[in-house]
Amino acid sequence: MNFKVCSFPSRRQSIAAFVRVLMVILLTLGALVSSDVLLPQPAAAYPFWAQQNYANPREATGRIVCANCHLAAKPAEIEVPQAVLPDSVFKAVVKIPYDHSVQQVQADGSKGPLNVGAVLMLPEGFTIAPEDRIPEEMKEEVGPSYLFQPYADDKQNIVLVGPLPGDQYEEIVFPVLSPNPATNKSVAFGKYSIHLGANRGRGQIYPTGEKSNNAVYNASAAGVITAIAKADDGSAEVKIRTEDGTTIVDKIPAGPELIVSEGEEVAAGAALTNNPNVGGFGQKDTEIVLQSPNRVKGRIAFLAAITLTQILLVLKKKQVERVQAGRDDLLKAAFIAG
């Protein structure tokens, strides 16, 4: 009988294999970290930053937290039906208007098109409709389902969208499924509020509190500008000599344009650059009624009863008028004969 001898890797081979795997892991992590350091993530129209930093995107004051990073105010619009029936799919149309002829400052200081993003806070129980519930005619208007992301697993009624190319998604159609109080006891018929937050373009402040390169940069101290050093990547350093002789260096990233020159005297907080931001954030609130089908039927029956009553009254009035006219004719004939 022949036996096949199984060979096992030596200890040295095992260690070498482990080292190779470890090196691959370290190189991968290094690439990821360096990409974030060398090419920092832009303060774009990223609603998920609110998701990462706030349990609820709407503060007690009613303000949506996206406004903390997007400082300029811009309009936002939303259109929904006045009322919907339970377990039905309807459209929530969000419009994020902006001037398509302008370009924004990108993370590297170059100019590029604006992106858009939105957070739609639907009433409790309202969610994005599943693919199989969206009517065919509505599918032509609605984008891919992966565009719509829930704010959290337990907040399916709060929907995030973006960042998306503004040229294609200035108008976003949300397919919304209304709840059914017959199967969801936490929902009742009545009037509910809907809150929209929408932005176009990059933000001015990161969630960490640091400025992006899409913001105004100011003098950190009062004094005289002694030197301005511009780097090849578009960034600059502005040196300010204060009254006590101290030199302060303000660093300006690539993107904002300097509006000061050497020898100029500046006050503390004075703008050293222009405001490169062309985007902004808008908020809009509206209402929707979850209507009971029985109430609709009752209202229709009530209106039908009123209409029928009015018709009967008109017919009765005409009948009385005919009888009265006949009686008048008889009296007139009797008077003539007498």
UniProtKB/Swiss-Prot annotation:
Residues 1-45 form the signal peptide. Pfam families: Apocytochr_F_C, Apocytochr_F_N. Gene3D superfamilies: 2.40.50.100, Cytochrome f large domain (2.60.40.830), Single helix bin (1.20.5.700). GO terms for molecular function: electron transfer activity; heme binding; iron ion binding. Its cofactor is heme. Binds 1 heme group covalently. It comes from the Bacteria. The chain crosses the membrane at residues 300-316. It is found in: Cellular thylakoid membrane. GO terms for cellular component: plasma membrane-derived thylakoid membrane. It is a single-pass membrane protein. GO terms for biological process: photosynthesis. Heme binds at residues 46, 66, 69-70. The keyword Cell inner membrane does not apply. Keywords: Electron transport, Heme, Iron, Membrane, Metal-binding, Photosynthesis, Signal, Thylakoid, Transmembrane, Transmembrane helix, Transport. The 4 large subunits of the cytochrome b6-f complex are cytochrome b6, subunit IV (17 kDa polypeptide, PetD), cytochrome f and the Rieske protein, while the 4 small subunits are PetG, PetL, PetM and PetN. The complex functions as a dimer. NCBIfam families: PRK02693.1. Belongs to the cytochrome f family. Component of the cytochrome b6-f complex, which mediates electron transfer between photosystem II (PSII) and photosystem I (PSI), cyclic electron flow around PSI, and state transitions. This is Cytochrome f. It comes from Leptolyngbya laminosa.
